[in-house]
Amino acid sequence: MAMLPPPGPQSFVRFTKQSLALIEQRIAEGKTKEPKEEKKDDHDEGPKPSSDLEAGKQLPFIYGDIPAGMVSEPLEDLDPYYADKKTFIVLNKGKAIFRFNATPALYILSPFSPLRRISIKILVHSLFSMLIMCTILTNCIFMTMNNPAEWTKNVEYTFTGIYTFESLVKIFARGFCVGEFTFLRDPWNWLDFIVIVFAYLTEFVNLGNVSALRTFRVLRALKTISVIPGLKTIVGALIQSVKKLSDVIILTVFCLSVFALIGLQLFMGHLKHKCLRKIENETLESIMSSIESEEDYKKYFYYLEGSKDALLCGFSTDSGQCPEGYYCVKAGRNPDYGYTSFDTFSWAFLALFRLMTQDYWENLYQQTLRAAGKTYMIFFVVVIFLGSFYLINLILAVVAMAYEEQNQANIEEAKQKELEFQQMLDRLKKEQEEAEAIAAAAAEYTSIGRSRIMGLSESSSETSKLSSKSAKERRNRRKKKNQKKLSSGEEKGDDEKLSKSESEESISRKQFHLGVEGHRLAREKRLSAPNQSPLSIRGSLFSARRSSRTSLFSFKGRGKDIGSETEFADDEHSIFGDNESRRGSLFVPQRPQERRSSNLSQASRSPPMLQMNGKMHSAVDCNGVVSLVDGPSALMLPNGQLLPEVIIDKATSDDSGTTQIRKKRRSSSYLLSEDMLNDPHLRQRAMSRASILTNTVEELEESRQKCPSWWYRFAHTFLIWNCSPFWIKFKKFIYIIVMDPFVDLAITICIVLNTLFMAMEHHPMTEEFKNVLVVGNLVFTGIFAAEMVLKLIAMDPYEYFQVGWNVFDSLIVTLSLVELFLADVEGLSVLRSFRLLRVFKLAKSWPTLNMLIKIIGNSVGPLGNLTLVLAIIVFIFAVVGMQLFGKSYKECVCKINDDCSLPRWHMNDFFHSFLIVFRVLCGEWIETMWDCMEVAGQAMCLIVYMMVMVIGNLVVLNLFLALLLSSFSSDNLSAIEEDTDANNLQIAVTRIKKGINYVKQTLRELILKAFSKKPKISKEIRQAEDLNSKKENYISNRTLAEMSKDYNFHKEKDKISGFGSSMDKYLMEESDHQSFIHNPSLTVTVPIAPGESDLENMNTEELSSDSESEYSKERLNRSSSSECSTVDNALPGEGEEAEAEPVNSDEPEACFTDGCVRRFPCCQVSIESGKGKIWWNIRKTCYRIVEHSWFESFIVLMILLSSGALAFEDIYIEKKKTIKIILEYADKIFTYIFILEMLLKWVAYGYKTYFTNAWCWLDFLIVDVSLVTLVANTLGYSDLGPIKSLRTLRALRPLRALSRFEGMRVVVNALIGAIPSIMNVLLVCLIFWLIFSIMGVNLFAGKFYQCVNTTDDSRFPTKQVSNRSECFALMNGSQNVRWKNLKVNFDNVGLRYLSLLQVATFKGWMDIMYAAVDSVNVDQQPSYEHNLYMYIYFVIFIIFGSFFTLNLFIGVIIDNFNQQKKKLGGQDIFMTEEQKKYYNAMKKLGSKKPQKPIPRPGNKFQGCIFDLVTNQAFDITIMILICLNMVTMMVEKEGQSDYMTDVLYWINVVFIILFTGECVLKLISLRHYYFTIGWNIFDFVVVILSIVGMFLAELIETYFVSPTLFRVIRLARIGRILRLIKGAKGIRTLLFALMMSLPALFNIGLLLFLVMFIYAIFGMSNFAYVKKEAGINDMFNFETFGNSMICLFQITTSAGWDGLLAPILNSAPPDCDPKKVHPGSSTEGDCGSPSVGIFYFVSYIIISFLVVVNMYIAVILENFSVATEESTEPLSEDDFEMFYEVWEKFDPDATQFIEYSKLSDFAAALDPPLLIAKPNKVQLIAMDLPMVSGDRIHCLDILFAFTKRVLGESGEMDSLRSQMEERFMSANPSKVSYEPITTTLKRKQEDVSATVIQRAYRRYRLRQNVKNISSIYIKEGDKDDDLPNKGDIVFDNVNSSSPEKTDATASTISPPSYDSVTKPDKEKYEKDKTEKEDKGKDGKETKK
């Protein structure tokens, strides 16, 4: 990191020739040094440019102001990185940094030349960029003209001139392209350059098609991006995500190609089948030759009315049949102008792309099924599930991750900045002394006027009696400072910093029952937050957390005076007082983005805050965590420590990184140097700098003030009304009234009523009703106006307008009043829609709504930029479309429209072009593209549409979604569920409840006194009732209110099982889901016996909010046998009972609940003797039967059979008499069996257990239905209406299967958990939509009626019929005229919602939009595009109602599953235990043991073949052949010549021969081992089938199936390409994600099938006979079970549900005929029932399309992120696989050991990252590998040591080690037991020692031999003597180091002997690990 020079006056130095010379000198010096430095390792990166001083950024404010005369002047570069580079900077007035190259521009202009200086001045001036911006915008407006006038030519020249001028200025200022920071070095300038070049080219050179070149001008719109800074980053993110998409795109293209090939083989030519009229004496050929044009088609082929294409038909039995008098032929062109077909590979590919993006795919689906047969539905199921759901969501996942990474990078950068500033400030501290004088003066200045307020602050601190002394003193000091600010009204400045209406501001402002003075004091208290308690870690004043949770709940109840809340309560339940008032200080420091960490409730941990009276309280901290805080007696351990807490994870909100920087910057002291004080100019700058960085908050406020000080004086005088004492009293009185919770409740009720009144508007309304609505509106307006006025009086305007909600209220009231006065003005009725905004006032008291609005608010920031980018893209494409295709639409319109008028969707003018582009963004591109291709040629249209589709829809819209999902940080929704702060509404409701209960109780007591004869029982009952009433009060809204503690309670005998007695009184029963037991997000402090807590000795402050500690807490939760140890995390709805005494599993439980037994003692039966004993034995027998596995299996079989029986009851049942009779008897049998099962279970389990299980209730209800219908049938009432409708409820029978199949139950439990949030979102959607719905009434009610000709449903033109009366006149004259309404319209609130749902799902929205656009007025005949701009209403609705709200579903569901995952300890919630095993196996692919390689055959011939086959080149050749084969299959097309068919046939034969050859070769060389490899078996099967298909094609075709199936099987070979994927890491990750998602997706699919099954049965019984029109016809209907399933599968993606609903909305003639007779059936009429139909379809769409399919998305996103994480790890599974592959060669017998001598070769044979290249002996020795006898080393030890080398030493290594051992043990149960006897290091040491000893001995012998030779030799011998000694020393060293070395490494390196890894070791290891982790955490904490 480059250290920045201390910013001071000397930082700004003019750039002169000397500066340039200095730089050149530095460069020269650098060059001379370079040669030496070259040797340095490349890894040491040089200094980097400072991120704060990058070009384009603002000058950091630490530099103070720019001295006069230095603005827009060349200055020396501030960034040290550029010290030796030729650059200089220029700063403009806005302090933006511009960096320039100091070399001469264009080799002419030096930095000092006047021309360049002037250019630079122009370039950096803010007006220059403004001018360019305005030019671009004006230019864009001109571009939208479709046929511009002559004079616009000159305007064009002007634009070109301005752009040229801009470029010249840039080139003069920067230089052209040589060197850094020149013109062409910035890619954005390339754009300018191209635009200008083209402008001149088109002018001077005649290039033919000008309009195409003119489209290049559109690129100018992109320049806006380069001018607006925020956009560049978004575009950066977009480009990043497109790069990341490459893998997905490859995978998508591959999958689509495969599917397209299958489609090509299956459906080639099928879509040309048409119904031809039978004509006497004419053959098909003669007819075809006589047909010339389209027109003739109509004569011969069968057309359905209103359709452009002839009716399709097929030759198979289950395909579409032709009507009477027609027969099926293959003739003519394909449907949709011939563009929909599978005839060639390219059209098939387009069709599959369309399927994948799900655009109008129901049409393709219906056409294909009609032509080919219903069995092919399977093809579509596979494509939709794999292609559409999987691939499209992968794109979403990738884009979301790219966004997330971008986010992460920004946060990193922020941290980096913080570091830089810290370093800077450290430097500045050196100058401290000089600055002290100034600081002192400032302090004097601020202290004036403090003392005045002494008394006041004194009293205010009295209010917090519980606080510790020191905190109180500190608070007083702060208060004195702050009071001064209050009086001068300056807190406004402070609020600017707290992100508005977020953090604590919204808390403090909403206190109730404080006088106005008290109210103000409370704000004081808030200002004083930072220093007031020891807990406040960083000043919460600056903690403007981005999505701070506080604002969601903490609206009310901050004051001390809370008498009102406790009016009915005795003192035992009073609220934990000071905790309320000090809420502000309880911020927990958070690290950016650590969203999922659990938050410890600090409130419960701070001793000074406890009341000392031994009562239990609940503290609620600022994050909404409730903690039960007991008096000291219970809360302290004997040694005075606080207890650890049981925390059940609670997510926290994001902290934005930037706020922390700001805090750092502000809080540090700032210093000035002496000499500044002399120079007045500098002194002034010094002052400005001091004001920025002093740590006195006041000055900070002043420097931050948004408004001039006179404004504050004015506000103080006029906006705070404290005139006379009487007025103040009056004000206080009003305040008490207005702020009372009951008033709030009343206002909320008014809002709800007002909303209802607005929703009740409908189309024909009576006068009375109209008047009621008008009067109602006046009344409500009055009420809201009064509320506003009273609040203004009570709070003073100054306070009133500080609260966001009040500003909102006042706006709405003002608008309502304005609207009242302007009510009669025509055209202003839209103002009425502003009243709707009142609905949003509900958010005040409805947390979910508030939160969702907040989420939308949060994402609007980044979305603002994204929306701009989207707008620019839409604009560009709209203009491009208009320029390229506009003319063609005009000229060739007759091709697409019979009457030669422009269709509704065209590109002839900008607005329509924009609509088409917008429609493509909505995902509907194919229909407009057909039109385009028909008029303007295929190529251009395809290119433009695909670009819009991919860029706009797939990338930008997914980025939209990603942003939305990221603003759903994981705390949001769950937080609401446990909204722990009662807001005013809840307080009011609680009060009402208390009142009612009080009345009930007194009444009951009176009655009991009068009648009671058994006082004992009555007392018990009363106790129970008390318990209930208290439960209701204190634990309302999932809040654990105060739990009082009563010491005498210990003496009571009956205790609730499993729970300690001290809470008996106030705890709910375990089965109650409201309790904290089922609400794991509450923090509960629990006493634990000292011996049981493994966290006991940790200091409580260390329970950090790090997520690692979740595990230890969970363990604590399980191990401590404390009061809460039976906490059961079961999902609500399973109703499991927590029993204390271990129940013997084969004994039934009690029959009745304790309550029953208490009231009716007769229920208690003694089981010791007599009848009781017999009864007990019977129960035991039943219990054994019911618990037997066979019984369960039998019942499952019965359920399946009875469900299956329902599928037979279709419209043909009347004709099949035998089946009908069988079904009737079967039905009775099933009913009896189920009744028997129920009775058995009653006897076995007892009523208590049976009726507390939700699944049993389900069984019970379904059995009841069967029973009722059975009884009715026997009594002969089976034809009664109600009985018939009950029969349809039998469709619910399959639901019983849910509880029996674990896979589905898992998913359903997850769903049930998500239901509350889904409901919340649904409600919010409804509220959101309500606004559009009410606007819709104002705009369209009653305007959708039209006069039509019933023969062909065409509308009369307005010239003939202009209004209703004229239409009725016509009707009298003719039968065929009708004044009819659109079925789906805006006439009443239900239909409005239905219309909006159709628009939001983009199904059926066209008709609604056309009707809206054509509408004229009530009772007027519509006219074509009369109201064109109504499209905008729909565009806005789609953006807010569809993009936002429907995507909130995805957000909520994903969010919820993350929540549930946490509750279940991070396991995937969609999988059963079995599937989890599969999943984990998938994850541990690396747990392979070394395999024996296939031995090379001994036979020489076989050996050669073996070498060939196992060679990699062979594999690659085969892959190439497969690819070629695929290409030849792609070449096939419909209607190819015979020659081509022959060629392809022979090519295919060649391929079959080649693949057979491969097969044979492998069989010869691999022998029986061939079949041990999965791929080989696959190949073998494919080859055999290919041969069979080739030789027996004719035979099979005549007798069995069509040979196309064999052609499809050949495609299976393509699957082998997947083997190549080993190489492509990215794609493998994606496939791995798919493999991991499979089990969960299978379960979700099962659930979806179940839902479809039930709905299909239901549909059959209700809609089998509806009229066939719109989407219902002879193939797609509800007549049989199969047809129903086909229809429902189509609606699962919401496709075409409008068409199926339309016929069901026919309720009376003339739409349908209620008397129509259906032959063979007793039913008559073909009318639907609209209410049932709407409920049926809407519920199905919500369940399948919005919930289940989104679960699918959630799973994919989840697994994708897991797979990506795994693939980014330094060592992946592949590396381990590679290790074992190499191992096989060195250990052919798979002994798992290799000899030490081979180790060096082995290490060198590996691939990176495990590779250790030779020479590697030393490294290997240093690894200290354990060896066994025979000098062998075990593979795991080697693998582990190598891994360690890659990953480095760390704590994680230990966990990895244990994982590997565990893996290995699981993979090799037959593990060779071995004891390591030595290690490589020891072996080396032994070698050395042996050598030394040998040497010494040799020398000794030598010495003996030469003893008696001359004295010289003796001297030599002495020298020799030394050598051994040296050796000895070495030896000693080695020896002494050896034990230590082995000791030191023993713990981490030498593995425990594998066969002795027993449980105790493991546990000890675990313990060590946790201790290490804890230590690590302590370290982290201290660092903080």
UniProtKB/Swiss-Prot annotation:
The modification Phosphoserine is found at residue 1487. Residues 1-125, 173-185, 228-241, 401-742, 794-802, 846-862, 965-1184, 1248-1249, 1302-1314, 1455-1511, 1565-1573, 1625-1637, 1757-1984 are cytoplasmic. The chain crosses the membrane at residues 126-145, 151-172, 186-204, 211-227, 242-267, 375-400, 743-759, 769-793, 803-819, 829-845, 863-885, 938-964, 1185-1209, 1222-1247, 1250-1275, 1285-1301, 1315-1339, 1429-1454, 1512-1531, 1543-1564, 1574-1595, 1605-1624, 1638-1660, 1731-1756. Residues 26-47, 487-508, 571-583, 1958-1984 have a biased composition (Basic and acidic residues). Residues 146-150, 205-210, 268-344, 362-374, 760-768, 820-828, 886-912, 926-937, 1210-1221, 1276-1284, 1340-1391, 1403-1428, 1532-1542, 1596-1604, 1661-1683, 1697-1730 are extracellular. The gene is SCN9A. Pore-forming subunit of Nav1.7, a voltage-gated sodium (Nav) channel that directly mediates the depolarizing phase of action potentials in excitable membranes. Navs, also called VGSCs (voltage-gated sodium channels) or VDSCs (voltage-dependent sodium channels), operate by switching between closed and open conformations depending on the voltage difference across the membrane. In the open conformation they allow Na(+) ions to selectively pass through the pore, along their electrochemical gradient. Residues 472-484 have a biased composition (Basic residues). It comes from Oryctolagus cuniculus. The sequence contains 4 internal repeats, each with 5 hydrophobic segments (S1, S2, S3, S5, S6) and one positively charged segment (S4). Segments S4 are probably the voltage-sensors and are characterized by a series of positively charged amino acids at every third position. GO terms for cellular component: axon terminus; plasma membrane; voltage-gated sodium channel complex. Keywords: Cell membrane, Cell projection, Disulfide bond, Glycoprotein, Ion channel, Ion transport, Membrane, Phosphoprotein, Repeat, Sodium, Sodium channel, Sodium transport, Transmembrane, Transmembrane helix, Transport, Ubl conjugation, Voltage-gated channel. This is Sodium channel protein type 9 subunit alpha. It is found in: Cell membrane; Cell projection, Neuron projection; Cell projection, Axon. Belongs to the sodium channel (TC 1.A.1.10) family. Nav1.7/SCN9A subfamily.
